Structure formats: C-alpha cells, structure tokens
Amino acid sequence: MNSSKRMSHCVQLAIIVALCAIARAATPTALSHGTIEQIEIEAKSLAGNQLGDPTTQKCLVYLPGGYAEHPDLRYPVLYLLHGFSLGSVLEDWGSVVTEAMDGFVTANPSQAFIVVIPNGANSVHGSYYLNSSVGGNWENYIIGDLVSSIDTRYRTIARKSGRAIAGHSMGGFAALRLAMLHSDLYNVAYAMSPCCLDLQDDFTSTNPEWNKVLALKSVADIRTAATENDFWATALAAFAIAASPNPKALIQADLPYREDEGRLVLVPSVVVRWKRIMPLDMIDDHQGELKALSGVAIDYGYEDDFSHIPDTSRQFGERLLALHIPVVVEGYHGDHNNQVPSRVGSRMIPYIAAHLVFQK
C-alpha cells in the first residue's frame, strides 16, 4: 500500500473514531447500573397534623445508568406511590424498581427516566395521599413539596410532558385520583391493583371487619391493631382519618357505618364524603382532565385478595370508554401482590416510557 493510500485510510479511520465519540457523547448509555438514593424532603404541607407525624419525609430516588456521565441531559420523572402496609415497603419498592429499570434502560438507553418513591405511610400506616385536617395534607405534599424538591435537586424535565404518576393499591388509588385532579402536572397515570375506587364489595357493610373498626376507641387503638397485624381494622380506620377526619370523634374520624340493634347501617353524610374522593365517582366531574392525559392504564389480578378491586377496576375502564376516553385495563391471573414485581418491568415501565417526552 503506497503512502497516499495509507494516509487516506488513516484519515477515514480518524473520522470514524471521531463520529463514534460524538455519538457516545450525545446518546445516554447503560454502561453503568442505576443507583438508588435515599433523601429527605421538607414536607411543609404536613405541618400541624394531629397524628404528630414529622414534616421531614423519607424518599427513594432511582437515577438511571448514565445520569452522572451525562451532566447536560435532563430526564423525565415517574412518581411511584406505594400501597398500604403494616410493615415497611419503601425499600422493597426500591429493589423492584432498580431491577426493572436497569433492565429497561439497558434495552432502551434513549428512554431512561428517574423514578421517585416517596413515603406515604403515616403513624396509622396509610395516608392514602389525601389532604386531611387530622392526618395532614398529603396530597399537597405529593404535588407540591415533593415535585418542587425533586425538580430543584435533580436534572428533570420539569413540565407536564416529563412527569408520570403510578402506584400500587393505596398508591394506585392515589395515582388515578391525583392525575384527575392535577392533569396539568402529570401526563400519564398507571394504577396497579388500585384500591378504594368505590364503596363496593368488601368496602360495604357485608364485610364483618367493620365491627372491629367500630370497636376502636382511640387512635392508640388503631396503632395497637396494627401491632397485632389486624390489617382490615387498621386500613379502614386509616382511610377514615384520611377521607372523613373529625378531631372530635373517638378515632378522630367519622365512619360510614354505625351499629343499630346488631346490624350495620349507612351514615349517609359520611358516605357522601367518601364517595366524593373515590376515583370511580369522580369521573363525571373530571372528564376534561382525564381527556387531557396522554394515557391512563389499570391492571389487576383476577384473584385479588380484595374483592372490590377487580370489579371497580373494570368499571373504571368501562366508564372511561363509554365517555370516549382512551384507557387500558388489563386483568391477569394473580392476587394482590404476587405478580406486581414482574409487571412493573413488563407492563408499567414500558407504558410510562411510551407517554413521556425525552430530551433528544
């Protein structure tokens, strides 16, 4: 090979190397795994709550592989709300998200996004992410304090098209509700096994667990029920504190049922308060907000432990379709929890990514 040909090949090789370097710099890669950070958020919205819960709240933040290597790149954010539990679930969700997101980002490096997992448990184990004169203004915390703090601390795409909200059980309830109320803030919602969509099935007086709730005489009794692993008594009482607070009541909340000669009867004024914040009953008044969302999805297990969840999930989807509002509702064989980790990676994350805007 003569010197001129060698020079030509060297120049071509140099150009190819330079172009590859430019491509690597412009496109995020998944050479490193994502990382989970635990941070504290100043929750001014919780100030003055009657349960004595702190105004500094723990939060997990998943940063995708490539976040540190690409300081000029901004990322969309998924706010993922956990469910009601008598134990700690935040760390479990951190592990699920890390595994699912690492796999997704490896396969789709141009669709990397941040995942924020805030604490939603108060001292009665569930805030339901609602504003409450007793439990504190958790809705305001999620949509205000939290979003503002994350947008300030991290390189986010700080607009509607760069935000998603999702959740499981209590968190699924909140994801649908907050998306309806704040469609200017979130672009897409995904609810996994969402509870509390309406006052049906095991939320009604046919559930004998209501007798345990009616027997509670104080907030301390609710906390005792939790230590005794009495899920229903704790969960229903906590929902009452969130949905129908009353500082003058024994458990600082009004209940939708009362006992009358050995049977449970409805308390209409409380039922109205509960149904006002239940997503299935909110649809008619929030059609415009639902239509403003890029996507709405629900999934649930056919064998869910809580009978109201499959029924109300289907009804929610049917109601939206009747109003010509696009929605995805998918049932599968599984209970309330056992398929959720795998479906985070196989269903939720790809759906969320398809409805977010990424920096080019």
Spell out what each predicted region is:
Residues 12-21:
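Bacterial N-terminal signal peptides
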